[in-house]
From Swiss-Prot:
The gene is truA. CDD domains: PseudoU_synth_EcTruA. Its EC number is 5.4.99.12. Homodimer. The lineage of its organism: Bacteria, Bacillati, Bacillota, Bacilli, Bacillales. This is tRNA pseudouridine synthase A. It catalyses: uridine(38/39/40) in tRNA = pseudouridine(38/39/40) in tRNA. Belongs to the tRNA pseudouridine synthase TruA family. Pfam families: PseudoU_synth_1. Keywords: Isomerase, tRNA processing.
Amino acid sequence: MRVKCTIAYDGHLFNGYQVQPGKRTVQSELEKALAVIHKTDGRVPVYSSGRTDSDVHAAGQVIHFDTPLSIPGEKWPFALNALLPDDIAVKTAEIADDGFHARFSAVQKEYRYFVYTEKHPDVFKRHYAYHFAYPLNVQKMREASRHLVGTHDFTSFCAADTAVQDKVRTIYELDWTETVDGLQMRITGNGFLYNMVRIIAGTLLDTGAGKFSPDDVKAMLEAKDREAAGRTAPGHGLYLWSVCYDN
């Protein structure tokens, strides 16, 4: 039986999502809890919609695992949350079709990047939003964002050492919303390359600060060269917000 779960986690104290020997990760904590439920010393593999890096958070990560246990779908959050640490929570669970895969069945993801622009750092926000105290021209950021919407080769906006050959992705929406204490970037697409969202966020913030123009961002995209684009924004402002699947 295949179980699909939507989970949330605070990425601050994790070394990313994926299992790493000797390090605390989201996947390792999930598999540890499942091993207890299954009363096994072996591994119960967990598959996610995608990896997240150290400090990156998730409000709507999706995972799946296979189990021989006849636990109803709606009971799995109770079983897992009783064993998981406080910085991971299973929000929902359901029995999925055998052909469902958390990663390969996904058709759209949404990320959000949070920035607070107060004059001085806030110790209570330092792990959950990026402090950017420079004046920002939000209109320029929105104008630059429009160049990135659509289907493009995003070589300039992914980590230079990525092993992925096909760097064409489609961004459906990319917008900036002003909040009480700063800004929120919302981006949806059919998939994202390694560090793609953080590089886009860093580049657009620097555009708002006057380092780049909207036309510069268009030229960065066309250059297909990581060195042409801006910096990578810190991980702690980034949230995997939701993952969508065909019914």
